Amino acid sequence: MAEATYTPRLRTHYDSVVRPKLIEEFGYKNPMQVPVIEKIVINMGVGEATADTKKVTTAAADLARIAGQKPVLTRARKAISNFKLRENQPVGAKVTLRQARMYEFMDRLITVALPRVRDFRGLNPKSFDGRGNYAMGMKEHIVFPEINYDQVEQIWGMDIIVCTTAKTDDEARALLRAFNFPFRQ
C-alpha cells in the first residue's frame, strides 16, 4: 500500500534554500553539521487556575486548536499557600511539536500570527539562551487563525520555545533568519 507523502512548505524551503545558504555562510564540511529545528514547545500558564480548574481545560482546548495536538496539563510541583496553590494542582498546559506539525505551526506563526500582534515591531534578537535555542512570549493567543474571537472566554498568553541543533546563538539566529523570522533591527 503506497502512502501519500506530504512535505510541509517550510521543510521543502529548508532543504532547498536554508541548508545551502548556511553551508555557504558557515563553511560546514558535512551536511549533517548544518543546524536544524528540533522541536517547538508551546507553554500556556494559567494563573487563574487556582480559583477555577475549568479555566485550565479551556486553555488546553485552545492550545490544542492552535497546535493541532493534545496538550499535557502541567501541575504544581509544590504547595504555596500565598498563591492558594496545592501540590499536583493543574496550573497550565504545554505541547511539544516535532516534524510536520512543527513546520506547519512555524509557518502559521511567521505568516499569520505575528503580523496580527498589536504594535508588533519585530522579535527580540537577544532572546537566545546561549546554546542555540530561541524563546519568545505572546500576550494574546487570539492572534492565531484557529481561535474564534467571539467564542473566547478569556485571553491567555503563551511561551514559544524554538529548540535547534545549533551550537551557538549566531548559527541559530542565521537559521531562524533564513526561515524569515521577523527580528528587530
From Swiss-Prot:
It comes from the Bacteria. Keywords: Ribonucleoprotein, Ribosomal protein, RNA-binding, rRNA-binding, tRNA-binding. InterPro entries: Ribosomal_uL5, Ribosomal_uL5_bac-type, Ribosomal_uL5_C, Ribosomal_uL5_CS, Ribosomal_uL5_dom_sf, Ribosomal_uL5_N. GO terms for cellular component: ribonucleoprotein complex; ribosome. PROSITE patterns: RIBOSOMAL_L5. GO terms for molecular function: rRNA binding; structural constituent of ribosome; tRNA binding. Pfam families: Ribosomal_L5, Ribosomal_L5_C. SUPFAM superfamilies: RL5-like. One of its GO terms (biological process) is translation. The keyword Protease does not apply. Belongs to the universal ribosomal protein uL5 family. This is one of the proteins that bind and probably mediate the attachment of the 5S RNA into the large ribosomal subunit, where it forms part of the central protuberance. In the 70S ribosome it contacts protein S13 of the 30S subunit (bridge B1b), connecting the 2 subunits; this bridge is implicated in subunit movement. Contacts the P site tRNA; the 5S rRNA and some of its associated proteins might help stabilize positioning of ribosome-bound tRNAs. Part of the 50S ribosomal subunit; part of the 5S rRNA/L5/L18/L25 subcomplex. Contacts the 5S rRNA and the P site tRNA. Forms a bridge to the 30S subunit in the 70S ribosome. This is Large ribosomal subunit protein uL5. It comes from Azorhizobium caulinodans (strain ATCC 43989 / DSM 5975 / JCM 20966 / LMG 6465 / NBRC 14845 / NCIMB 13405 / ORS 571).
